[in-house]
Amino acid sequence: NVYVSLFGSESERKSSLTGLRNSAGWVRRELGKRLRIRYTPEIRFFPDESLDQVYHLEEVFDEIHEQQREAPMLGIGLAEAADTLRGAERFLLTTHQNPDGDAIGSLLGVYHLLRAMGKTEIHCFVDDPVPRTYTNLPGAQAIARPAEEPPEYDLAVVVDVAHAERTGAVADCLLPGKAMLILDHHLGEGERGAMGVIDSSYAAAGEIVVALFAAAGVPISPEAAHCLYVAQITDTGGYRFSNTNARSHRIAAELLEAGVAAAEICCEVFECISRPQFELLRLVLDRMELEADGRVAHTW
């Protein structure tokens, strides 16, 4: 029996198979002559349907991927998120456009977590430049603008935002069918087809990353603690905003124990300003006027 792969429409395939079967006698005689054998067995042609099965499987997989993309985000726990990180080897990390301290600090926190896990192929993309205040964070040099050609990766990790479209140009690097893990503390349903930890009880995405270190059983390095402390203090306003809770202070204590230089970091984040910022502040103060016995101030 000879199995042959046939291409074309159904009628074309039938016609090809009929032609092969009609030529079976000639093929048999030619084989006998060329191989110089006394007896040549009967030759029967049959269609090889394995390719059809492959094509069918491809269609099934395409349907599954499409259903996954349209499915609501799958909420998972921190332990499962840690297992997801361990199970991948190549990563794409990103956050929202116009990144703040929580966005950059959380992204770098995940970067240091992956490095501590022994992962080496990590791409960090942010659509906008890293603000000057955060360019000296440990690992910030790993952050780049989106590549024209999406890199190969197994898992995308999106921090401090729950929807890919808010990552700007990085969204073009987030390939369909690739796994996506979201770590966010804002209320929302999250990216369809992704999985994630979204918990608004955390004051900052950086706090979720701290909890992820614990779930993964990985100690927080001084470098990671620095980044995550910046993430926390920027989103809590130095622990002055109403989102600050008892857990926030416990997390802060954990980061301090990991080696954070709190006074130095707070000075750099809250008290150091650029020359243009200083000039703007000077202009605002120069034009300030007081009303209502000094209880109201306005400027222009």
Place the predicted regions along the sequence by residue:
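Short glycine/serine/threonine-rich phosphate/pyrophosphate-binding segments
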Residues: 101-107, 164-168
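Short, hinge-like loop/turn segments at secondary-structure boundaries
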Residues: 61-62, 111, 139-143, 198-201
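Charge-rich, low-complexity N-terminal segments
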Residues: 1, 5-72
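Short alpha-helices
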Residues: 183-251
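Short beta-strand segments
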Residues: 94, 157-160, 182-184, 231-233, ...
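Active-site cofactor/cluster-binding pocket
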Residues: 140-195
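Hydrophobic helix-and-loop "lid/oligomerization" segment in the mid-to-C-terminal part
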Residues: 75-97, 105-135, 149-153, 234-300
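Short, polar loop motifs at secondary-structure junctions
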Residues: 32, 127-130, 183-188
